[in-house]
Amino acid sequence: MFKLVSDYEPTGDQPQAIDRLVEGIKKGYRFQTLIGVTGSGKTFTMANVISRLNRPALVISPNKTLAAQLYGEFKTFFPHNRVEYFISYYDYYQPEAYVPTKDLYIEKNADINDVLVRMRMSALKSVRTRRDVVVVASVSSIYASGDPSDFDRMNIQLSTGLKISPHAVAQHLAKIGYERSNEITVKGCFRLRGDVLEIYPTYQDEGIRIEFFGSVVDRIETFDKLNRSPLEELQKIIIYPAIEFVTTEEKLKRAVESIKNELDQRLTELKNQGKILEAQRLQQRTMHDLELLSALGYCPGIENYSRHFDGRKPGEPPYTLLDYFDDDVLVFLDESHIAVPQLRAMWRGEHSRKKSLVEYGFRLPSAFDNRPLTFEEFLKKVPQIIFVSATPGPFEYQVSEQIVEQIIRPTGLIDPEVEVRPTKYQVDDLISEIKKVVERGERALITVLTKKTAEKLSEYLVEMGIKSLYIHSELDAIERIEVLKKLRRGDVDAVVGINLLREGLDLPEVSLVAILDSDKEGFLRSETTLIQIIGRVARNLNGKVLMYADRVTPAMQRAIDETNRRRKIQMEYNEKYGITPKTIVKPLQIEIFEKFMEKPEIDYHQLAKDLSKEEYLSLLEEEMYRAASELRYEDAAKLRDEIFRLREELKDENYL
């Protein structure tokens, strides 16, 4: 079923890791952990496990950037199978919120990326129709999705000779999210001209042309979307929905009645509590939604009523991507030391935000049930899972029935030397080391503890003739990609940052990592974090780590000891098999991301003191995204209003 394509065979620790993980799955182990050092080929090991077991797989990553990186690698390994990408379709998302202390209601505000919507639909269709599928997803995949049974029921099955009118098919297409258009230019559209119906599904590159003879299907074929020439004639075809959330007429009517019943109960509760204003507000808002649902089958914020459409009881878990898979889906949780805490926290953050909306009459209590899975619910839905990390967390060690180490790198690369240097004259020493790196055509990463320090250090490096970039620690997928491009291309020699220099940065050009304030104990200087930072330079033959500190903390010592242990294992392997280490040569695969994300490039150098309005607008947008991600809704709303005002000014200036 799966056909793995690669120019190389498993080597080093990979063969034993693959064998043990496969055997563990066959024995029925629910939880296993793969401890794979940077550059040991963890993705290749995962691909081999999938290929050997021939089971559909879900690979969950902690963020969009890592997910896109994994997606590109799996596409390379499985060119003849379906590899799909499933992440949040929002480029920007500010959720609905209410701030009671200021009586401030903030409406939901979002920018939807149509390309990502279509990729999600492609993933759902593949999972429901075939077994040879790998879906690479972010942790947002545990958020509520549509009912898979509705997704199956609402498709359109056509065959030659079937008695059905073209107008009936067109009406059904509209019900499952397709838009009627005079031109078939984007996915999710259809066109009806006479007896010819043309459809451009969201989940495939070819269009579908259906010719009718009266009210009978006469011919079905796929066609090229560019030159419109026929590709393949078919006897039958199934057309799947263009949107995730589809429902039947019966379910819609049932949901409307169920919402009315909940509204009556909630209004009684609020009035008994003396909350007359809240009751009036809730009645007005909900009745307006019900009118739209009855007339159009849709209303803004319809996701808040998902429990009524699904027929779930209060508190029952929502449908998610996991429910679309067969029961034997194999799940990998990449960078699990980050992903596990994320999965634990997502439900709490969502519940906290909705609490004030429900209490103050903006939403019915059923809004609580439009949510991500709790961590416990996630584990119940997953039949078997493999945690993957260079530094697994306590949970992984606690539950795993088998822990597999993958220390040896096929390239022979050895973990970098770690050197502790005093903080006195640390900046001068650092500049000297960076200049040595630059002379070799390599790059440097510097990690500090505060944004202010990062900015000042970056500016000083520029003054000293080093092309340096200062980056915020909270970057969205697009912004991080731009940084990766500039650093890997050599547009800059060094990047100074905070938390961003940890997991997932695949930068073989980097040969120096400097860790300032290494002895300041805390989350950013824990053993796990230090090992992750050290790993950023493990893909380069000249890899070196400088820890600037006045004392060696227990976390530093454990990180250094673990690094030295891994160095020893790799050096013994290299000597035994006569391997000469070589720096990893890896082409820029940024175009994978650019296919999905459409945003103007943003310059993060931020050294210009006099900003143009366009530059100021970019900075405001960046700050707005960050405020929303940190649940600072009031700040995000103020920034949004300022952005709208500035955009209007720019429109007026361009007009003049």
From Swiss-Prot:
It comes from the Bacteria. ATP binds at residues 36-43. It is found in: Cytoplasm. GO terms for biological process: nucleotide-excision repair; SOS response. Transmembrane segments: none annotated. GO terms for molecular function: ATP binding; ATP hydrolysis activity; DNA binding; excinuclease ABC activity; helicase activity. SMART domains: DEXDc, HELICc. Belongs to the UvrB family. This is UvrABC system protein B. It comes from Pseudothermotoga lettingae (strain ATCC BAA-301 / DSM 14385 / NBRC 107922 / TMO) (Thermotoga lettingae).
